[in-house]
Structures are given as structure tokens and as C-alpha cells.
A protein has these predicted regions:
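Long, amphipathic alpha-helical stalk/connector segments used for oligomerization, subunit docking
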Residues: 400-493
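Mobile, glycine/GP-rich and aromatic-enriched active-site lid/loop segments adjacent to catalytic centers
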Residues: 96, 103-155, 231-380, 385, ...
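Helical element adjacent to the flavin cofactor pocket in flavoenzyme catalytic cores
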Residues: 129-156, 160-163, 168-179, 219, ...
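Glycine-rich active-site loop/strand segments that organize a redox cofactor
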Residues: 59-91
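Glycine-rich loop(s) and the adjacent beta-strand/alpha-helix scaffold that form part
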Residues: 187-246, 381-394
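N-terminal Rossmann-like FAD-binding beta1-loop-alpha1 element of flavoenzymes
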Residues: 13-39
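Glycine-rich FAD pyrophosphate-binding loop
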Residues: 31-53
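Core beta-strand elements of the Rossmann-like FAD/NAD(P) dinucleotide-binding domain
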Residues: 8-11, 174-184, 362
């Protein structure tokens, strides 16, 4: 088997990833310009990305009596100060506007008898959001001069002299290669799951918090192209209902359930109420012999029972089925909780591309938005949309500039370079497709499991209670590099398996950068998220960003000063 031909396409804007941020960016670009757009989506935009199964709340909203600055302060506190306040503020100022636009497109937002949105806490409003992604996808599909290419797996940027020219990939179904040239490129590929050994084994390994199909592709392409990354050491670990990995917020906020240990003691206030502290408290209670830990639902009303079962049917039906199977309602049994494996996701933590306030990366012409963009945690759905809108507006502005300078190289030089890189990638695709089983040592799945075990054991996974030390990280680095070498001899029987090969390569690249970040921050600022046993205390000396950039095959660490309230960062060095 081999690659089935080559399609060369040209567009004004290439959007890689048709999830929340990517789709919303496309709507904004077409609303404000006549620019042509190609959206390259690995799955199908109707049900792809984090919104695939729907959501029951907008978790980032400025409710009545609050202001955008309040949201900035909340996110800053949760991240213990390691945030970009300029990014948080520009996002927060748009949260309500993008929500209103989604309502106009058909999203059902619950309202009280006075016509006001029904709040769920200080930053959330309730919605009927099972169909939120199809609503967004339908709006994109109705746009003129927008081509959506589903089942297209982008593997590489085309970057010359730190300027992006487009991207290369292949169709998972047809095996056709694609070289897409664009004036501007937006990366909206989501975060990275599957780096660590998951909660559940075997067939159920993808029963996880974050989409298992988000494999860090955008991160890996940026890393390999020399883009600067930030704060990967701020991993995200979700506190979830045990086994089903269903959300806990619906119970905690919906019925006011507290975290309790097996003795019935409320322990959450003992450790703190930030996201990482809630996970850490649960871990410590189990280590110290007071587990299992639960959300206390015993004693809630029958109406609350029904409300919870209906809510979970809408977004995590396995939790409702578990209640039914046990023969007990939530009011009759507490809900056991556990932490997930760690993820790299810029929508909840500050990890991702280092961007300026317009969401430009350090590669000229390349933007990042949503879970792939760093510095701006607690984005959730509306924050991803806001970042897509911010990037889109700057893209339109740049495309409309009459004084725009040409690249330092000619069009013919750019064409020659792009074609050469595309030919190299097609050759690489074919090497994986043509390699027979007898010529490879391990399958892609075996290598993925090996990678996850290494990260779990030596880089702070579930088995080590999310803890690590420098000696362990050194071993993790060595072993991940060994697995990366073995991955070069992987093989694929078809185009779908070829995608798995590249997903493995993407994860390995992200793992290497993550390990360097965990090593570089010599403190424990976020319990569980980055629990460094060699440096168990927090220090003001580390009130700074840990950034990295791959240069000549090596990952270089760079420290940057915090961007505080009233400050704005623009790329200069």
C-alpha cells in the first residue's frame, strides 16, 4: 500500500482543527472578510473535538454582578499566578458576546421566569447543549468560500525562515496526500491526551476525561518547527467519578455535594479549593488510609436524584447507567471519585503555544487558539471561541494590510521549498505503509503502551500519585527517546493505521517537552499537577514562565517574566 496521489491546494487561511476554536474562527473570518478558508479536520466537524458529546453548561460566563476582571482574578488564583493576564482579560471581555452569538445560532440557554439566564455558580450558566457542536458545524458548512476537508490528518507545517507557508497531511480514508498553501494558518487542534497510562485498561482505555483523539498534533508540529511553548509543567488532572470518568462539577455544584473520605469527614477545606488542590486532597486521603473518597450525595432529595440522572444522560450516560445497575439512586450512595491521568490542555491550565495578545505564535503567520494556546487557563467552551475570534480578527487585519511586507524569499523559492518538504513527507508515509511486519519489532499500540507506562512510572502518573523527582525524570527522558527511536521502524497496514503512527510520534514529541518543563520548574507550585519531590515547597523565585523551544534537535529552556495586570506582551525576542 502507498499514498494515493497528491492534492495541492491554495487558500487565504488554513485552519487546522475543526473544533470549537477553529469553527468559531471561520465564522468570524467570513463575517469580516471575503477571505477563502480551508478547514482541515481529522474527524468530521459535526461531532469532533471537546464538544462532540455536548455540554450542559457554559462554564466561562460573566454573570450578573460580575465583571471580566473578576474572571481574570479567579483564573489567576486557580493557577497560583502563573498566567498571562493580558490573554485572560482579552478573552474574558468576549465571553458573553460569543455566548449571545451561539444563542442566535440555535443554542438553548435556560432562563428563569424573568427571562434571565439561569446561573450555576459565579461563572456558569445552564444550557441544553447536546447539539452545540452540530449547531456550530452547520453554521460553518453554510459559509461561502469555505472548504471543509474532513478525515484529513495534518502531520507537518511548511515553515521556511520562521515563516509558515502551509501544511502537509493525508486523508485517512482515501490515502491522498495534501499540500495546502496559505497566507495565514490557525492551529486549533486541541490539547494532548494519551501521554500517560489511563485510569481504565484494555478496551476501556479511552474512557477518559479528555478526547483520546486529541494527541497533541498541533503542539508537536509547532515544537518541530521551532515555535516557543509555555508552561507544559502545569499539567491538568481532572477529578472525576470513579470508573465512569464522568464530571464531578455537576454533582458538586448541582446539589452542593462536599468531598468526604471513608470516615465521612469533609476534607476539601483541609487542602484548598483550587482545581489542583481538590485532586491533591483526594490523593493524600487515599495515601494516608482514609480512602476511598466520595462526593456526598446521600440524603439529597428525590427531585435532585432525577435531576442528576437526567443531567448525566445528556453528557456521561455511563454514570446514570451505573446508578441504575447498582439499584441505588445518588441519594442512597455517595459517588466515589478519583483523579485522571495527566493531560496537557491549554483550556484548563496555562500550557501551550507562547502567543501574543492577538494569539500569534512565534512563527510568522501562525496563530493558535483554544486548548492549544498557552498562558490563558479556564477557557472552557466560550473562551476557546473568544480566542478563535481574536485570532480571526487579527488574521483579517493582516490580510487587508496594504503595506504588508513580502517574505525575505521569492515565491519560486517558497514553492520549491514546500514541494521538497511535501515529497519528503510522502516518502516517509510510504515507508511506514510499505514496511512489513517482519521488518518491525513492536506494533504502534505496543509502543504507545510502553510510552504511557514510562510516563506513569517516571514522570508523575497515577501509579506514583502524580509525584516525581529529578532522577525519575532523567529515566523518563532516556526511555522516551528509546521509544521514539523504535517508532521510526513502525509500520501501517492502511491509512488509518498510518494515522496511529503519527499520533504516537506526536505524543512522544509532547512527552519530551513535558519532561523538560517538569525538570525546569524547581518548586512545587501546584500539588499533583507538578508535584516535585526534590523541591516540595513553593518559592517566589519561580514567579515566572518556563518556556521551551526546539533548536537543532535539542529542547532549550527559556524563562520569561510574568505579564501582569495592565501589561501587554508582543513578540520581540
Amino acid at each position: 500500500m502507498q499514498i494515493n496521489g497528491l492534492n495541492r491546494l491554495t487558500t487565504d487561511v488554513l485552519i487546522i482543527g475543526g473544533g470549537t476554536a477553529g469553527c468559531y474562527a471561520a465564522l468570524t473570518i467570513r463575517e469580516k472578510s471575503d477571505a477563502s478558508i480551508i478547514i482541515a479536520e481529522k474527524a468530521n466537524i459535526k461531532r469532533s473535538g471537546c464538544l462532540a458529546a455536548g455540554v450542559n453548561a457554559i462554564n466561562a460566563y460573566i454573570v450578573e454582578g460580575r465583571k471580566p476582571e473578576d474572571y481574570v482574578e479567579y483564573a489567576k488564583k486557580d493557577a497560583d499566578d502563573i498566567v498571562r493576564e493580558d490573554l485572560l482579560l482579552t478573552m474574558s471581555e468576549r465571553l458573553n458576546e460569543v455566548t449571545a452569538k451561539m444563542e442566535k445560532l440555535g443554542l438553548v440557554i435556560l432562563k428563569d421566569e424573568n427571562g434571565r439566564y439561569v446561573a450555576r455558580g459565579n461563572r456558569n450558566i445552564k444550557i441544553n447543549g447536546e447539539n452545540i457542536k452540530p449547531i456550530l458545524a452547520d453554521a460553518v458548512n453554510s459559509l461561502e468560500n469555505v472548504i471543509v476537508i474532513n478525515r484529513l490528518n495534518i502531520t507537518d507545517y511548511i515553515v521556511k525562515d520562521n515563516t509558515i507557508l502551509g501544511a502537509v497531511g493525508f486523508n485517512i480514508d482515501t490515502g491522498e496526500a495534501y499540500e495546502i498553501r496559505a497566507k495565514k494558518v490557525l492551529c486549533a487542534t486541541g490539547g494532548a491526551a494519551g501521554l500517560y497510562k489511563p485510569n481504565n485498561p484494555g478496551f476501556s482505555r479511552h474512557k477518559m476525561w479528555y478526547p483520546p483523539f486529541n494527541t497533541g498534533a498541533g503542539f508537536a508540529m509547532g515544537i518541530n518547527a521551532g515555535a516557543e511553548m509555555t508552561t507544559f509543567e502545569m499539567r491538568f488532572i481532572a477529578l472525576r467519578c470513579k470508573d465512569t470518568i464522568a464530571p464531578t462539577g455537576t454533582i458538586a455544584q448541582g446539589v452542593g455535594a462536599k468531598q468526604v473520605n471513608s470516615l465521612g469527614e469533609v476534607y476539601e477545606n483541609r487542602y484548598g479549593l483550587t482545581t489542583s488542590q481538590r485532586v491533591y486532597g483526594t490523593v493524600r486521603e487515599n495515601i494516608e488510609g482514609r480512602g476511598p473518597c466520595y462526593l456526598r450525595t446521600e440524603g439529597i432529595s428525590s427531585e435532585q436524584d432525577e435531576s442528576l440522572k437526567k443531567a448525566y444522560l445528556n453528557m456521561a450516560p455511563s454514570q446514570t447507567l451505573k446508578w441504575i445497575e447498582s439499584g441505588k439512586n445518588p441519594s442512597e450512595q455517595n459517588v466515589e471519585i478519583e483523579g485522571t491521568e495527566p493531560y496537557i490542555v491549554g483550556g484548563h491550565t496555562a500550557s501551550g503555544y507562547w502567543v501574543d495578545t492577538n494569539r500569534r505564535t512565534t512563527i510568522n503567520g501562525l496563530y493558535a487558539a483554544g486548548d492549544v494556546a498557552g498562558g490563558c487557563p479556564q477557557k472552557y467552551v466560550t473562551g476557546a471561541m473568544a480566542e478563535g475570534e481574536i485570532a480571526a480578527e487579527d488574521i483579517v487585519k493582516e490580510l487587508n494590510r496594504s503595506d504588508i511586507t513580502e517574505n525575505a524569499f521569492s515565491q519560486s523559492t517558497a514553492d520549491e521549498y514546500a514541494d521538497k518538504l511535501t515529497d519528503e513527507r510522502i516518502k516517509e508515509y510510504n515507508e511506514y505503509l510499505r514496511r512489513e511486519d517482519k521488518d518491525t519489532i513492536f506494533s504502534t499500540e505496543e509502543l504507545e503502551e510502553a510510552m504511557q507506562k514510562v510516563m506513569d512510572t517516571y514522570a508523575g502518573g497515577i501509579v506514583s500519585h502524580y509525584q516525581f523527582n529529578e532522577k525519575q525524570l532523567k529515566l523518563a527522558k532516556e526511555k522516551i527517546e528509546q521509544i521514539e527511536t523504535l517508532s521510526e521502524k513502525a509500520n501501517a497496514k492502511d491509512y488509518h493505521e498510518l494515522m496511529f503512527v503519527y499520533e504516537l510520534k506526536e505524543r512522544l514529541t509532547v512527552c519530551q517537552v513535558l519532561i523538560e518543563h517538569l525538570k525546569a520548574r524547581k518548586e512545587t507550585r501546584w500539588h499533583s499537577f507538578a508535584e516535585n519531590l526534590d523541591y516540595p515547597e513553593k518559592s517566589d523565585e519561580w514567579l515566572k514562565y518556563v518556556n521551551t523551544r526546539k533548536v537543532d534537535g535539542r529542547i532549550e529552556v527559556k524563562y520569561r517574566n510574568l505579564v501582569g495586570r495592565g501589561e501587554t506582551y508582543e513578540h520581540s525576542n
